[in-house]
Swiss-Prot record:
It comes from Streptomyces griseus subsp. griseus (strain JCM 4626 / CBS 651.72 / NBRC 13350 / KCC S-0626 / ISP 5235). Residues 292-321 are annotated as: Disordered. S-adenosyl-L-methionine binds at G40, G41, H42, D59, L93, D107, Q114. The gene is rsmH. It is found in: Cytoplasm. One of its GO terms (biological process) is rRNA base methylation. This is Ribosomal RNA small subunit methyltransferase H.
Length: 321
């Protein structure tokens, strides 16, 4: 896998959002966590831009850790790479003896490497085994989900995780076909979806298989349930003044991040209190007005940036003692 194809999304804006926390004189040796290391583009930029920072980088994909390890080797012991899912952040920090961090970055979704490696089965544009596991050493692949889940559960997944309006129609075709022969490769599924959808549904929203593949990937990797735990855990790990930046790539992820940040930025005091006790005051300050989008120029140069949505927040209050 050539690293030249890996272009970090909204890189400068992510660095700008995190910079005040990583250049704070109160923390001369700040700790920043890249929860989604991938090929290490954001991590490398963090290490280069903030020369006194220590980086903790997580990924569940062992191949990503190997490739990034080579890329980040020049930074020596400033970079600590950990094989972990990002909701394991509290355990990782505890193991490393790090009580609080100054910055956290999430770049959600599928890495360039996973999309570009045909045999991983993430991309619907090329035929490959239906796997889609980010950590190939554990769990159930996409083919097993398609071949074994009850029809009602498949419909739920396509609707909830793919926002697929034609879920019932697609699942009926899947069930009919899997009884003849179990699914193993992506091309057969793409063809089935194309045949199952009405003509009008094929005219909008790019490749007709896109939503189904997204739904299967989220189910296989437990992405939303992991994210539901990971974002609050990351906020908890932040020191006062620490900052978090999250890049998401579909509305389900972005909505979840939005809800966590909004809840953290809310005043939770009962109405009518003349003075608001500290425990009711906001823990977070939102740093972005809604979700920020990539520039037209960036999308023109890197089409994978097109669906990106960036949100940032700052920790402004410590935990109650």
């Amino acid at each position: 896998m050539s690293q030249t194809r890996h272009v970090p999304v909204m890189l400068q804006r992510c660095l700008d959002l995190l910079a005040p926390a990583l250049q704070d004189p109160a923390h001369p040796e700040p700790v920043v966590v890249d929860c989604t290391l991938g090929l290490g583009g954001h991590s490398e930029a963090l290490l280069a831009s903030f020369p006194t920072a220590r980086l903790i980088a997580l990924d569940r994909d062992k191949e990503a850790l190997r490739l990034s390890g080579e890329r980040l080797a020049p930074y020596g012991d400033r970079a600590t790479l950990v094989h972990a899912v990002y909701d394991e952040l509290p355990e990782v920090l505890a193991r490393l003896g790090i009580p609080k961090v100054q910055g956290v970055l999430f770049d959600l979704g599928v890495s360039s490497m996973q999309l570009d490696e045909a045999d991983r089965g993430f991309a619907y544009a090329q035929d490959a085994p239906l796997d889609m596991r980010m950590d190939q050493s554990t769990g159930m692949g996409a083919a097993e989900v398609l071949n074994t889940y009850p029809p009602g559960e498949l419909v739920r997944i396509l609707r909830a995780y793919g926002e697929e309006k034609q879920a019932k129609r697609i699942v009926s075709a899947v069930v009919r076909e899997r009884e003849k022969e179990p699914f193993s490769n992506s091309a057969r599924l793409v063809e089935l979806i194309r045949d199952a959808l009405p003509q009008a549904a094929k005219r909008t929203g790019g490749n007709p298989a896109k939503r189904t593949f997204q739904a299967l990937r989220i189910e296989v990797n437990g992405e939303l349930s992991v994210l539901e735990r990971a974002i609050p855990a990351a906020v908890d790990s932040l020191d006062v003044g620490g900052r978090i930046a999250v890049l998401s790539y579909h509305s389900l992820e972005d909505r979840l991040v939005k809800q966590v940040f909004a809840a953290g930025a809310a005043n939770t005091a009962p109405p009518g209190l003349p003075v608001v006790p500290e425990r009711y005051q906001p823990r977070l300050k939102q740093l972005t007005r809604g979700a920020e989008l990539p520039t037209e120029q960036e999308v023109a140069e890197n089409r994978r940036a097109a669906p990106a949505r960036l949100r940032g927040a700052q920790r402004i209050r410590a935990e109650e003692r």
